[in-house]
Amino acid sequence: ERLDFIKLKQLTFEEPDTETFYGLKLGIKAGETGGSMPTVFNAANERAVARFLEGKIRFLDIPKLINLAMENHTLISSPTLNEILNIEQQTYDFIEETIKSGKLD
C-alpha cells in the first residue's frame, strides 16, 4: 500500500544516532568538508558495499573502509572533472588494496 501523506496526520523526526550509524556521520562530515571529500565518501561506500555483497568483507567493515579512505585523502577544495574521476579511481584502488592487505582484521 502506498503512503498517503494526506491521511498521515503527523511525522516525527529525531536526531540521527551517528554513533550507531557511523557511516551517516562520515557522510555528513564529507558533505560539510566539501571539495573532493564527497567523491571519496561515495566511491569508498560504493566499493565497500560491493565487496560486502560479494562476501569479501563484514558489514561493519564498510564504515571502517570509508573512514580510512577519507583519512588517506588529500582534500582538493575545487576539483575539476578530471580530478574527480581520478579521485574516484584512486579511492576504488585504495579500498581494494586495504581489503587485500588484511588491515581490517
What are these regions (language model features)?
Residues 1-105:
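Catalytic, metal-anchored helix/loop core of enzyme active sites in primary metabolism
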